[in-house]
């Protein structure tokens, strides 16, 4: 019979718990099993009642969903594209170590900001007075932004893009959901 060979990895209690935590907010949470890649929970809020579509949605209800400033029809978990923030740092570290751009012993001084050569703009670290002299291990421990700005700059956009692509940046996850969007990974 149709559908009898479909097996889900969703954990219903975890899914419901996350939905409760996110109630009233605009957010997304995806929880996966690191051993299998199976999706344990995938939550996007706000959501909507899918039963509205079962027998054909009224134009009034559909207009309300389309015009809702909280955009409940957008699945933030699969269609949202977000800056990776500090989660990118371990990948930059592995990439730079593997490419020979840095070693475990490479140190850089972090004054609390980083400046792109030829630019006046300073990119501030979360710790405004800086972290001082850091190697890659300490930079990860302290989540030092400027260390990774410099290392990424030293890698160059082509090499950085190639390495980040190996970790899945800029690619689809393969979750088998038609609405999924790939992330952005800049290239030259």
Where are these predicted regions, by residue range?
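Short hydrophobic alpha-helical segments used for membrane anchoring or interfacial signaling
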Residues: 29-34
């Amino acid at each position: 019979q149709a559908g009898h060979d479909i097996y889900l990895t969703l954990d219903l209690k975890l899914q419901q718990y996350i939905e409760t935590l996110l109630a009233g907010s605009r957010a997304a949470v995806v929880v996966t099993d690191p051993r299998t890649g199976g999706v344990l929970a995938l939550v996007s809020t706000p959501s909507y009642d899918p039963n509205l579509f079962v027998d054909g949605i009224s134009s009034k209800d559909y207009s309300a969903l389309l015009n809702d400033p909280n955009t409940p029809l957008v699945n933030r978990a699969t269609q949202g594209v977000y800056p990776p923030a500090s989660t990118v740092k371990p990948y930059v570290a592995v990439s730079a170590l593997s490419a020979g751009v840095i070693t475990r012993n490479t140190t850089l001084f972090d004054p609390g900001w980083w400046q792109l050569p030829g630019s006046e703009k300073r990119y501030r670290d979360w710790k405004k007075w800086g972290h001082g002299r850091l190697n890659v291990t300490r930079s990860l421990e302290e989540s030092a932004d400027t260390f990774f700005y410099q290392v990424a700059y030293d890698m160059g956009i082509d090499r950085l893009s190639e390495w980040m692509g190996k970790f899945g940046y800029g690619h689809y996850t393969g979750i088998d959901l038609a609405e999924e969007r790939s992330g952005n990974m800049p290239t030259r």
